[in-house]
């Protein structure tokens, strides 16, 4: 059969590494010490770690240029907030506030005893003094020259006994002075017609003016401290209380990142222990304990150098980056095992320089492919609009490059020094010369003699696990019936994966950014349980400054648009409450119904001044630049509902004859749904094509390069499908892991594919056996070391870290399955090339 390999680049890379290996073998001390000095210098960047930390939820976990941010800019510019005439409805951001939810331990919270406790808590909040000496009264958002107040407390006028005769109606309650909306303050309501029979929960808000962030932050910190200190006392009362502030997510997010630091020591202990155990030999000369330790140390230096460099350059350090060291340790140790395996294939009687040259030549393409694919996958992740993903990808991609650099310098140098020790037949611990084994008892040989090797091949003795792959696993895998079973197994795997892909849920639940034990979780749970009936009260903004509000035909077109919003449904349920639309224009027309521009514009300022609508119309030189109305969404309780609601509202606004924009502060977070799937697919496609190019350049066989690319697609489908079945959503956190998946899915299949086409065996089956014989054990070692690197994250209290573990576990599991089961079998069918 004619040769069909394309190895010009592969040969050049191998030859260059052959020279580098020899150079490292001749000058090991330089290559050992220089990386240490570089790491020490770059490590100074950690001085800036606290300054570079990025904990902003909006900044890190929402699209950089999401539509809602542009809409917010328009609203902020045309409808500036007025803290002296505060209206929660009209906020263009979340505001600065503290809140608590009181849930009755009985069936009804509308009792005198329950409200006595609520009033007590309200008084405690109002009397609380922050460290800067400010009370709520000094900082509160104002309405009609008094602090913003909660409707439920206004209704009872601060007297708990009044609640018994309040005769509340829902969602609107008519008080003596005005109509009050209770949909956001009373939860778990049971009605008789519109009369409230009972309710389960009350929610109160304490909004602050936004002109002094430092004082607000101080007071809000005191707010959480007060409720934290009262927790034991509150548990003995009639109500259960959960609490939250506008700063809570970011504060808990920051604490969350610190919780993973103690796990680093456990991870390094596990990785080093596994490396040592894997490299243990009964021969006291061939033992590679110190090689294993320095391999793990090399990965640690890579993290120190890469992170330090980027911190010096001013790169933001997102919390998601905290998972990177666990990953880099696994990658570094994986390459270490490949290099050790190649070292063991060299002739023991050759000098160290020649052995190093042969080792580097053999390992060069494998570790170069994995490094390029891993690093490129991470750098392609920079295309995402999420800063948390960008930060992770920049730090991890750079760490992968440093890991590669230190493996071929620092670790290679120590491998050469260890080779010199072996050449001198010296003990691995004492470095004393020991006699070569002859006929001494085995126990004596372990401690006192060493340097044995295979007399036939002149190489180090093969480990039993390698013989297992050659004598048992390889022949079993290439058996015809086994191949049939593997094909059926793959079909089952692929079918389950595709099914799972159709079950994927999108979006990150904001409470998952805090630890499981955080007070934030209980507040969100109560909010979801008792206050999900009424969703965001959405602004509908008329952006056309030429719209003729005084023209009856124009008003009718606008009313038609509002009616379209009110008729929207989700899965057969109403999306917008039809009788709760708030329009300044409709109210104005009730007072005066002019079709004349002059009368309309002359009478408008007086109308606005006497109503709450004065913040809803932007007038300049008797021209209405913009105005806004409000629609009340309902039945929005899940992430899927949020996504569909946002899409339907925007589609309706775009479909109207007038220029409309819909906006609510929550849309900033909902925007992730619009880009998460398309962006993930974009990254995967771009990265897969890049991996194909790299494989074609470095693997001397186009068909096998295509199989590597196939492995990427197959592993990604598997991970995406099974992560959905494991209750992991597709969000910016799991997107990071799918980026990782692209790189890691190449690693194992690339090793095996390259070994297959490089094999000197004659038949395809023998090539497959030879490939798993040489690389089966290193692949298992690399997989286990990577799993050990992240397994401690399964015990973390954070969704982010547990998600990282889950997806990495799937990536490694499916990567190994492809590397030592699927790909070797498939190569025997389609990879028969490059031999006679």
Where does each model-flagged region fall?
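Feature of extramembrane
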Residues: 2-290, 294, 405, 411-681, ...
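Internal alpha-helical transmembrane segments of multipass membrane proteins
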Residues: 37, 257-288, 293-305, 372-380, ...
């Amino acid at each position: 059969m004619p040769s069909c390999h394309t190895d010009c680049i592969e040969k050049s890379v191998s030859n260059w590494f052959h020279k580098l290996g020899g150079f490292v073998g001749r000058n090991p001390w330089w290559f050992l010490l220089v990386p240490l000095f570089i790491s020490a210098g770059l490590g100074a960047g950690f001085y800036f770690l606290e300054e570079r930390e990025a904990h902003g939820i909006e900044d890190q976990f929402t699209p950089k240029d999401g539509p809602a941010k542009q809409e917010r800019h328009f609203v902020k510019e045309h409808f500036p907030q007025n803290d002296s005439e505060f209206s929660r409805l009209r906020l263009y951001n979340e505001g600065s506030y503290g809140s608590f939810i009181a849930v009755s331990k009985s069936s009804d919270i509308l009792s005198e005893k329950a409200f006595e406790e609520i009033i007590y808590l309200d008084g405690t909040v109002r009397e609380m003094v922050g460290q800067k000496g400010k009370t709520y009264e000094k900082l509160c958002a104002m309405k009609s020259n008094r602090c913003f107040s909660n409707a439920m407390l206004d209704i009872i006028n601060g007297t708990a006994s009044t609640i018994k005769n309040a005769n509340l109606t829902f969602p609107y309650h008519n008080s003596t002075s005005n109509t009050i909306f209770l949909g956001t303050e009373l939860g778990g309501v049971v009605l008789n017609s519109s009369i409230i029979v009972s309710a389960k929960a009350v929610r109160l808000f304490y909004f602050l003016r936004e002109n002094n962030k430092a004082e607000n932050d101080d007071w809000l910190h005191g707010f959480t401290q007060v409720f934290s200190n009262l927790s034991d006392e509150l548990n003995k009362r009639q109500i259960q209380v959960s609490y939250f502030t506008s700063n809570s997510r970011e504060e808990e997010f920051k604490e969350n990142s610190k919780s993973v630091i103690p796990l680093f020591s456990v991870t390094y202990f596990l990785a080093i222990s596994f490396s040592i155990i894997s490299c243990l030999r009964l021969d006291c000369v061939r033992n590679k304990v110190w090689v294993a330790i320095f391999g793990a140390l090399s990965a640690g230096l890579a993290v120190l150098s890469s992170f330090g460099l980027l911190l010096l350059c001013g790169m933001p350090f997102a919390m998601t980056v905290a998972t990177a060291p666990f990953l880099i340790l696994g990658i570094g140790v994986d390459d270490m095992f490949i290099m050790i395996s190649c070292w063991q294939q060299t002739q023991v009687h050759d000098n160290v320089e020649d052995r190093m040259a042969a080792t580097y030549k053999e390992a060069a393409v494998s570790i170069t492919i994995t490094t390029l694919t891993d690093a490129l996958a991470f750098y392609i992740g920079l295309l995402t609009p999420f800063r948390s993903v960008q930060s992770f990808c920049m730090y991890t991609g750079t760490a992968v490059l440093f890991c590669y650099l230190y493996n071929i310098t620092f670790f290679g140098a120590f491998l050469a020094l260890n080779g010199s020790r072996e050449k001198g037949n010296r003990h691995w611990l004492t470095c004393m010369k020991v006699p070569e084994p002859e006929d001494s008892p085995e126990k004596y040989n372990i401690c006192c003699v060493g340097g044995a090797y295979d007399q036939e091949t002149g190489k180090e003795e093969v480990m039993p696990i390698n013989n297992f792959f050659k004598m048992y696993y390889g022949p079993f895998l290439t058996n015809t019936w086994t191949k049939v079973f593997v094909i059926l197994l793959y079909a089952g795997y692929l079918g389950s994966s595709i099914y799972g892909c159709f079950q994927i849920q999108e979006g990150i639940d904001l409470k998952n950014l805090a630890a499981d034990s955080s007070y934030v979780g209980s507040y969100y749970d109560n909010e979801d349980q008792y206050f999900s009936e009424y969703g965001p009260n959405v602004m509908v903004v008329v952006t056309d400054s030429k719209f003729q509000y005084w023209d009856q035909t124009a008003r009718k077109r606008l009313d038609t648009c509002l009616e379209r919003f009110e008729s929207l449904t989700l899965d057969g349920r109403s999306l917008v409450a039809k009788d709760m639309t708030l329009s300044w224009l409709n109210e104005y027309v009730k007072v005066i119904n002019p079709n004349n521009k002059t009368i309309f514009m002359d009478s408008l300022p007086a109308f606005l001044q006497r109503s709450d609508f004065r913040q809803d119309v932007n007038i300049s030189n008797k021209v209405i630049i913009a105005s806004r109305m409000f629609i009340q969404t309902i039945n929005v309780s899940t992430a899927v509902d949020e996504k569909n609601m946002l899409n339907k509202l925007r589609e309706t606004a775009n479909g109207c004859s007038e220029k409309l924009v819909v906006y609510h502060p929550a849309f900033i977070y909902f925007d992730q749904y619009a880009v998460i799937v398309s962006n993930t697919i974009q990254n995967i496609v771009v990265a897969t094509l890049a991996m194909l190019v790299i494989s074609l350049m470095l693997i001397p066989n186009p068909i096998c390069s295509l199989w590597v690319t196939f492995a990427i697609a197959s592993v990604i489908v598997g991970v995406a499908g099974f992560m959905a079945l494991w209750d992991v959503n597709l969000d910016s956190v799991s997107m990071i892991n799918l980026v990782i998946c692209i790189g890691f899915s190449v690693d194992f299949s690339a090793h095996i594919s390259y070994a297959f086409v490089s094999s000197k065996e004659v038949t395809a089956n023998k090539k497959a056996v030879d490939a798993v014989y040489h690389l089966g054990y290193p692949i298992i070692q690399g997989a286990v070391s990577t799993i050990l690197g992240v397994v401690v994250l399964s015990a973390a209290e954070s969704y982010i870290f547990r998600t990282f573990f889950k997806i990495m576990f799937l990536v490694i599991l499916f990567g190994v399955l492809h590397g030592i089961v699927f790909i070797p079998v498939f190569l025997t069918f389609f990879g028969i090339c490059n031999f006679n």
